Amino acid sequence: MLWFQGAIPAAIASAKRSGAVFVVFVAGDDEQSTQMAASWEDEKVTEASSNSFVAIKIDTRSEACLQFSQIYPVVCVPSSFFIGDSGIPLEVIAGSISADELVTRIHKVRQMHSLKGEASLANGSQSEGSVSTPSASFEHNNTSENCQSRNVELCETPSTSDTKSDSATGGESSGQTTVSQEPSGCSNQRPTEDLTVRVERLTKKLEERREEKRKEEEQREIKKEIERRKTGKEMLDYKRKQEEELTKRMLEERNREKAEDRAARERIKQQIALDRAERAARFAKTKEEVEAAKAAALLAKQAEMEIKRETSTKERSTVARIQFRLPDGSSFTNQFPSDAPLEEARQFAAQTVGNTYGNFSLATMFPRREFTKEDYKKKLLDLELAPSASVVLLPAGRPTTSMVHSSSGDFWTLLGTVLYPFLAIWRLISNFLFSNPPPAQTSVRAASLETSNLASSSNSEKREPVRKRVLEKRGEDFKKEGKIYRLRTQDDGEDENNTWNGNSTQQM
């Protein structure tokens, strides 16, 4: 197809000069536009439209299409407009058709254009009748498509007006062409008037179509808003369901994890209980073994101690350790065989003390017992003086009480003080009732008293230097502050030699 390369006004002027049909092909980017463009580029179509056609191709997004749609409404894309000399569309092809059908349409348009040209030479009103045929054919060809039916409505208006004008002048209209029978004077004015009426009607139709488009657009916007809201609601419901499912899955997962943790804890507790039971069993077994070993060791130790005790008892039973306590409070100790008689111990004591106490006897304080001459012949073991015992030397003629008093201490002193009145009464009664004691006994008592006094005095004399030494040593080791004694240190001598102020500061 040979397309015109200029603008629409130039193409219209070229078509008028050559008396050709003006063809406008409105194409888009869709598949039907591509197919229709391929049909126009076919060789048959190019050959059929080589003469009597000026064709121009415009895009739906171009400004030329916008200007063209203001006069000829473009209802469907792609669209092909065949416009005659009077500006009325001879044929409108909506959508895509095959190349053969397009060739057929081109031949029909060429026939209509030629008939219109012959009628215009015979009568000026022939142009109106020639439009009815393409309008009828347009209506016949576009019944299958919704977009083509809208173009048919736009094209029926001029055909109806042409029919009415013909009936008013007494003319007759046919299905394909209409030949006017009016006089030549009226035919010269009618095309101009009809064209004005048609333009007004087309303008009105365009306004109605625009209003319908606006209403349809509003309805479409309302539907879109409803659909949008519906879609939004569905999306919200879907999101809410997803969130609920997610929350449910999370809860199930959490419950499952808790159950697994609980089961794991139970397993661990059971394992711990088993371990404790095993450990307790091992410990009990070990404890029994240890206790058995301890018991065996204890028995062995007890047996050893018994053996040692028996050995020590035997050793002790062979030796008797005797402590001799003198009337002055001093004492000495010696060991004797346990089977030795008590006389041997008395002889050792006599050798040790000499004639200090004269004739003396032996006695024990706990239990209180004074040995007689028969006891001196008995063994120490028989007298229960083995393995150790404490024996008191009693000078002859001295009572045991005095000895106890001299050797016991403050307790016996207090006891003697309490019993002294009774003893005094007893002496008075005994002196009154009985005769004086024999002179031998009196001399013995006097001698014993003298010896005891001498022993006590000598003992006190011996104790005096010892007491002094103890006090001197105590004075060196202790420091007296009032009634309190404290240990001395190396700094005590320096502190005593220093001079101190009243506020506990040392003078320089």
Curated annotation (Swiss-Prot):
Pfam families associated with the record: UBX, UBX7_N
Q: Which GO terms describe its cellular component?
A: cytosol; endoplasmic reticulum; endoplasmic reticulum membrane; nuclear envelope
Intramembrane residues span 414-434
Gene3D superfamilies in UniProt: Glutaredoxin, Phosphatidylinositol 3-kinase Catalytic Subunit, Chain A, domain 1
Keyword Membrane annotated: yes
Q: Which PROSITE patterns match?
A: UBX
Basic and acidic residues bias (residue ranges): 460-491
Q: What is its main location?
A: endoplasmic reticulum
Q: Which InterPro entries match?
A: Thioredoxin-like_sf, Ubiquitin-like_domsf, UBX_dom
> What function does the entry list?
Involved in endoplasmic reticulum-associated protein degradation (ERAD). Acts as a platform to recruit both UBQLN1 and VCP to the ER during ERAD.
* Oligomer status and interactors: Directly interacts with VCP. Interacts with UBQLN1. Forms a complex with VCP and UBQLN1.
Q: What is this protein called?
A: UBX domain-containing protein 4
Q: What is the organism of origin for this protein?
A: Bos taurus (Bovine)
